[in-house]
Amino acid sequence: MKKLNVGVIGLGQRGLSLIFTILACEEANIVAVSDIVEEKRKAGVARVEEIRKTTPVAYENYEDLLKDPNVEAVFIASSWEEHIRMAIKSMRAGKITAMEVGCAYDIEECWELVRVYEETKIPFMMMENCCFDKFELLSTSLARAGKLGEVVFAHGAYSHDLRFEMLENNYNYRLGNYLKRNCENYPTHDLGPIAKLLDINRGNRMLSLVSVASKAAGLKEVFPKYEKGKKHLNDAVKQGDIVTTIITCANGEVITLTLDTTLPKHYSREFTVRGTKGYCVQEANMVLFDCKELHDFYEPHKALQRWMDNGENYNAYLPDMWRNITQKEMELGHGGMDYMAFKAFFKAAINGDPMPVDAYDAAAWMCITALSEQSIAQGGMPQPIPDFTKGKWLTRPRLDVMEFPTVSED
C-alpha cells in the first residue's frame, strides 16, 4: 500500500490529539513535527515514538519542515490566524496540504488561497470533520434519495460554552479574537455540512448574508474567577455572546447560523434541514416525514417524546463506513468523524481524486467570518458573498464527502 509521509504543524491540544488519528490510518507515516514551543515538540515526537516506534524530525520553524524533502503531505493545526498563510506556503512548497478548520480575517486571504491552489494544482483539503458526522451524512443521504422533498431551509450552530477553555489554557488563542473582533468566528462546523448538502460551489452558491450580534456579557462575567481573566477586567470584550447570520443561496434556499460560545448551554451544532416532504433535527436525533400525526401535537415536548432518537431507524441510508464503524475508530476523535475525514483525505491524495472539501469550499465557508464582521459593524447590512469559483459553480458536478447507498423501499 502506498503511504504518505506527513508533517504536522502545530502541536497544541488539537494537533497533538490528531497524531493518534493520523497514525491510525495505515496510509500515513508522520516523519516531521513543528511547533514554536519546545515542550510541545517533545510531546509530539514522544507520541509518534509511542505509536509507531519511529522518531520524527522536530522543527521549531515550520518553514524548515516545508523544506524537508521527506515530507510529502502537511497537516496544519496552528492558530486560526496562521491557517491560510501556512496552507499557501505549503502548497507553494509542493506539499499535499490538509488544513484544520478556522475563520478568515479578510476576503483577500480567501482569494489568495484559491489563486495559489489554481496556480500550483497541489491537492488541498480543509479538514472539516463535521461534514463526516453521522447525522449530517444521514440527512444528506435522505435528501439525495428524495425523502425530504425539495430542501428550502437549513440551520446550524456552534453552541459550545468555551469560557473555561479560553481562560484555563495559557496557550489558547481564542481569547485574543474575542477581545478584538465581533463576528461569526467559527462558521465551518455548522455551515460545512449544510453547504455540502445544498451543493454549494457545485450547482449552487451563497449570494449574500446579514449578521447581527447580541451584547457581550458572558465572558466578562467570569473574568474574576480566573487568573488569566483578571488581567482583562478593565478590557472591553467585542465578541457578542450570540451572533445570528442569515445566508441566501442562488437556488432559493436560506441558511441560518448561530454562534453561541460564551453563555451556559449544552454542546450542539443544531443541524436542521427542512424540505417539502420532511425534516431532520440533529439535537433530537430525529427524522420526520409529512404525515397527519405531525399536526396532532400542540405542545412541542410531546412531539419530541414520540419521535426522539428515531434517526436510528434510517441507518440503512448511512454510508458503509458509518454502518461498519468500530469502537476503536469512534474513539479516534469526535465519535469517529475525525478518523473518517483523514481516511477521505489520504484516499484522495493517494489516488489523485478530487478532495471532498477543496480550496473553493474553504474560501466560501471561511469568508463568512470576515463578511459577518462587516455586516455587524454596519448594523446588519447585507454583504455580497464572492463567487470564488468565478462561475465554475454552474457546471462543477456534485461531490459528496462519501458515497451513499441506494436503499430499496420494499
PLM regions: where:
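N-terminal Rossmann-like dinucleotide-binding module
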Residues: 1-51
